[in-house]
Amino acid sequence: MAYKTEHITQQLRAAREAQKMSQRELSARSGLTQSHISQIERGTMEPGLGSLVDVARALDLEIVLAPKKLMPAIRNILDSASASSDVLTSDQRKLVGRLERWFAQHRGGFGSASEADTFKDSLALLRHLPLSAEEMDTFNEATARLDRSQADPPSRQELSRIAHAVRHLRNAAVHRDRDDAVPRSAYALDEEDDNA
């Protein structure tokens, strides 16, 4: 039997599988039982609105009501955003993973332990902060020297420059996300100012 919410439950299942999350993990996050989630995904039970919202939020999704005439524009925005960010994030994660493996083998090449720790922390953050295409190019250029390090290991000065470039990218990504999140006005007016 096909339910009216079938297309929504199919999208929720696809989102769960894309995040490589098991039904058990989704159950723990959403507060629904695993059998309930299984029945919803198989289509043997029509979920209530509350259950749909719980599952969607556990998957970092939101259920939104939008005017039907805006749906083509919304679909285009979602498709273009997911296509570009998935490719960049995949490339970025591969590069960060490669650098983390390199770092595990060559940690002693850094001038100081604090510089090595900063480099490691920067990589850990860059695994989760999306970079623009231009920033990814800079990231690739800054770390390209490490790919050739087996035959010709980089000097401490080169490692210091690479660590500085990676830290700069990390800082740019962190501050961009923070600045985009909270719009601030150019002027602050204090309503309780008695000097007026």
Swiss-Prot record:
Residues 174-196 are annotated as: Disordered. Residues 23-42 bind DNA. InterPro entries: Bact_TransReg_Diox, Cro/C1-type_HTH, Lambda_DNA-bd_dom_sf. GO terms for molecular function: DNA binding; DNA-binding transcription factor activity. SMART domains: HTH_XRE. Residues 12-66 form the HTH cro/C1-type domain. Keywords: DNA-binding, Plasmid, Transcription, Transcription regulation. Pfam families: HTH_3. The keyword Ubl conjugation does not apply. PROSITE patterns: HTH_CROC1. One of its GO terms (cellular component) is cytosol. This is Uncharacterized HTH-type transcriptional regulator y4dL.
